[in-house]
Amino acid sequence: MDYSFDTTAEDPWVRISDCIKNLFSPIMSENPGHMPLQPNASLSEEDGTQGHPDGNPPKLDTANGTPKVYKSADRSTVKKGPPVAPKPAWFRQSLKGLRNRASDPRGLPDPALSTQPAPASREHLGPHIRASSSSSIKQRISSFETFGSSQLPDKGAQRLSLQPSSGEAAKPLGKHEGGRFSGLLGRGAAPTLVPQQPEQVLPSGSPAATEARDPGVSESPPPGLQPNQKTLPTGSDPLLRLLPTQTEKSQGPVLKMPSQRARSFPLTRSQSCETKLLDEKTSKLYSISSQVSSAVMKSLLCLPSSLSCAQTPCIPKEGASPTSSSNEDSAANGSAETSASDTGFSLNLSELREYTEGLTEAKEDDDGDHSSHQSGQSVISLLSSEELKQLIEEVKVLDEATLKQLDSIHVTILHKEEGAGLGFSLAGGADLENKVITVHKVFPNGLASQEGTIQKGNEVLSINGKSLKGTTHNDALAILRQAREPRQAVIVTRKLTAESMPDLNSTTDSAASASAASDVSVESSAEATVYTVTLEKMSAGLGFSLEGGKGSLHGDKPLTINRIFKGAASEQSETIQPGDEILQLAGTAMQGLTRFEAWNIIKALPDGPVTIVIRRKSLQPKETTAAADS
């Protein structure tokens, strides 16, 4: 049966290529002109005469000793085989050369080494050189895919063999490996050649250093070959220059950290220059308090963890007078002995004025208040003489009105354990209605409650040397959490008084200060009457809603009645009216409380009669407001 294709029966719409026809042609099985699978397989005379009509056997190539059967097949009249024929012998020799090059890290030998007496090495080196030139692209692809460590010395050796300065150093290596290369065509040459590389790398640098630098410069080909030039003494200089650059890069982020912290929490007096002329007094107070807290915190961080052991060497810094040195020693030792059990102590900034009168005079007026003098000496003893003199010079410049406000500023130092809280919470922030950051709540069993200086409603100026002026609420909470880590905490607080409130409003917002001043003028002109009212507490409450309070939308306002609910007992009795200020509720003062805290007090009351003290304005301001509304 004939399996050959009939040319007349072909489909005109489907074209069959010649290679597919040859696959099914019976001539393929009889065609002797195919290339042999084995390069050294001998051809019979009968096959040779069939493949060649002239009767001449195929000639051998003098270079590689393989029969050129594929050339005679092109000349024959027989149909050619498919294009996927077996690979010729020269390609197999090139594959052997690639394997030898992968196992040999020394790369190509010098062309001048062809005059060697061994004929066998000449036969194998010839195809190897040709294979390296023709298959360099394949070698690069294979090295790119593998990224093995054995390929890196191969590239480095190839780079070295092309340089004229490295030719002299590579010649003795090529002569030494020339005889061995002819006999070791497989992978057996790898164990004898690879261990020799670290011996040459060690004089210029350790192998660990080269492995650490290679990934950093392996992105581009020219820099990637530089680490392997360590085998030559001339190539080690540029590599050693890379070391200081790497160290500079590693030290870069470390040097930037203090600057970032300084920018995020400014502690210097640069803030006083940015404020307005009306805010000079408050800015001076902020700068002085920040300097005191930062100086005290800096000295505490320089001391050991135990403060009792560290206060004694700080006393000679302050003790400038021989007459007061004994008193300071006893005071500091007394505070040092109680530091383990005591929660802390505080210093009023007004005590700095006493040091302006003279550092050499002993103050006998403070003997009556020995505890405050003792705590003041303990805090001031932590400051160095330069910092103390600088603070004294700034205090001398202040006027009398500003010096009076120093009485309300306290520097409190709390002794605690690592990870313990300070015992109070914060309220307010630059992003909230209440711009000033104040103490929201003092916990009953906390450190601040045991020490006694920090009270609810006090303004917090700084914590551990970090100023809270102009910070947001989240930033203030982050500073408060950071104060858990050290064993000591330095908190600068300011007691808010009626005189200091307008100053605070002017520093935060000029519009808010203007509205506050207008409200004060209205309240002063209007006459107010105080009433005592008894209401019935039900499950729904007292029957009215509140507005105002500390930290409200319009600032710190008194708690007033906003709206009276319909159907409540208070509506029927008409004892209270919208706008009445609540002064006292069931014996609890309502001044300085937020609206949320006032509601918590109302919810905690039992059901029954509740006594409320309210303050109601006269009818004259109400009539004016009604006329203005109309």
UniProtKB/Swiss-Prot annotation:
Modified residues (Phosphoserine): S220
Region feature (Disordered): 30-268, 316-343
CDD domains, sorted: PDZ6_PDZD2-PDZ3_hPro-IL-16-like, PDZ7_PDZD2-PDZ4_hPro-IL-16-like
Cellular component terms per the entry's GO annotation: cytoplasm; extracellular space; nucleus
Signal peptide residue numbers: none
Biased composition (Low complexity): 129-143
Classification via SMART domains: PDZ
Domain called PDZ: residue spans: 410-495, 532-617
Biological processes per GO annotation: chemotaxis; cytokine-mediated signaling pathway; induction of positive chemotaxis; positive regulation of inflammatory response
Bias (Polar residues): 321-343
GO molecular function: CD4 receptor binding; cytokine activity
Entry superkingdom: Eukaryota
InterPro entries, alphabetized: IL-16 (IPR020450), IL-16-like (IPR055287), PDZ (IPR001478), PDZ_sf (IPR036034)
Keywords tagged on the record: Chemotaxis, Cytokine, Cytoplasm, Nucleus, Phosphoprotein, Repeat, Secreted, Transcription, Transcription regulation
Region of interest (Interaction with PPP1R12A, PPP1R12B and PPP1R12C), ranges: 404-500
Quaternary organization: Homotetramer. Pro-interleukin-16 interacts (via PDZ 2 domain) with PPP1R12A, PPP1R12B and PPP1R12C. Pro-interleukin-16 interacts with GRIN2A. Pro-interleukin-16 interacts with GABPB1. Pro-interleukin-16 interacts (via PDZ 3 domain) with HDAC3.
Role this protein plays: Interleukin-16 stimulates a migratory response in CD4+ lymphocytes, monocytes, and eosinophils. Primes CD4+ T-cells for IL-2 and IL-15 responsiveness. Also induces T-lymphocyte expression of interleukin 2 receptor. Ligand for CD4.
Name of the featured protein: Pro-interleukin-16
